[in-house]
């Protein structure tokens, strides 16, 4: 996997940047999904058939035609089959460029964002712009399943190691939903920590919870984007556990007014966006 690709070298992430005072769609920067999928051997055929990068954008503002500031929160679904993912700092800079620009109404802003994101991602993107009142009524949710974090085990290594999943299943066939709040990886470019809650829903041979937890913890010093981590977890579970059905879903904490929540499945529909306690 060659992370020195020119598409990474040109990213604004980790560089000192200035904030645009007027709307500028050219601030958006794509990252080819193939950069990570080539290494996983899934560029042409992905083992998941349903998926999206689900973003929540909390810091959106623009001016109405009379110059009065408006604010909103956006739910954004970026299809897993898009050619590119969107680099998060460039997305933040792009959203900030709306701050001093005039738009006629919510719909004009929503349509503008959707058009620009589709062009950058080279794939399907859905944008829903919400008034703040919608989120005032939103409850803090939790992901349903058995939490695997309270095991009395000793951890001595924090280097990524997929081999923790070797021989991880028994002969018992089950349907399980498992949750871990201990997912932590690091940004591919800046090395900043990314904190997430991981949800795994599968049907197949029962996965050993200790081996799974050790595997999750091994991401602690691993450098990849959120979306790439989730696809790696999906591929590793398919390789070692070989479930009949599998969903991998991670909800990461907010940074720069954005949270990113990748969802990949071979049997479940996309979830409604929600908000966890750490979000």
UniProtKB/Swiss-Prot annotation:
Its EC number is 1.7.1.13. NADPH binds at residues 88-89, 255-256. GO terms for biological process: queuosine biosynthetic process; tRNA modification. It is found in: Cytoplasm. One of its GO terms (molecular function) is preQ1 synthase activity. The active site is at 187 (thioimide intermediate), 194 (proton donor). Keywords: Cytoplasm, NADP, Oxidoreductase, Queuosine biosynthesis. Substrate binds at residues 86-88, 226-227. Pathway: tRNA modification; tRNA-queuosine biosynthesis. One of its GO terms (cellular component) is cytoplasm. It is an enzyme of class 1 (oxidoreductase). The keyword Oxidoreductase applies. It catalyses: 7-aminomethyl-7-carbaguanine + 2 NADP(+) = 7-cyano-7-deazaguanine + 2 NADPH + 3 H(+). Catalyzes the NADPH-dependent reduction of 7-cyano-7-deazaguanine (preQ0) to 7-aminomethyl-7-deazaguanine (preQ1). Homodimer. This is NADPH-dependent 7-cyano-7-deazaguanine reductase. It comes from Haemophilus influenzae (strain PittGG). The lineage of its organism: Bacteria, Pseudomonadati, Pseudomonadota, Gammaproteobacteria, Pasteurellales.
């Amino acid at each position: 996997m060659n992370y020195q690709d020119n598409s990474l070298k040109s990213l604004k992430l980790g560089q000192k940047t200035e904030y645009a005072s007027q709307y500028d769609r050219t601030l958006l920067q794509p990252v080819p999904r193939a950069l990570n999928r080539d290494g996983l051997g899934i560029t042409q055929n992905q083992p998941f058939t349903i998926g999206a990068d689900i973003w929540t954008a909390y810091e959106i503002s623009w001016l109405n035609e009379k110059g009065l500031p408006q604010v909103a929160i956006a739910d954004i679904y970026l299809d897993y089959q898009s050619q590119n993912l969107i680099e998060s700092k460039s997305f933040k800079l792009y959203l900030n460029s709306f701050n001093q620009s005039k738009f006629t109404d919510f719909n004009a802003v929503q349509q503008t964002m959707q058009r620009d994101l589709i062009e950058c991602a080279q794939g399907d993107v859905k944008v829903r712009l919400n008034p703040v009142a919608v989120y005032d009524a939103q409850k803090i949710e939790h992901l349903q399943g058995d939490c695997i974090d309270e095991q009395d085990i000793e951890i001595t290594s924090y280097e990524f190691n997929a081999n923790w999943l070797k021989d991880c299943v028994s002969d018992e066939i089950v349907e399980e939903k498992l949750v871990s709040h201990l997912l932590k990886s690091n940004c591919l470019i800046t090395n900043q920590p990314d904190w997430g809650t991981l949800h795994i829903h599968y049907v197949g041979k029962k996965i050993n919870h200790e081996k799974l937890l050790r595997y999750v913890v091994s991401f602690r010093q691993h450098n990849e984007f959120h979306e790439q981590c989730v696809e790696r977890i999906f591929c590793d579970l398919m390789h070692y556990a070989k479930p009949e059905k599998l969903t991998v879903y991670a909800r990461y904490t907010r940074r720069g007014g954005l949270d990113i929540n990748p969802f990949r499945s071979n049997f479940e529909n996309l979830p409604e966006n929600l908000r966890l306690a750490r979000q």
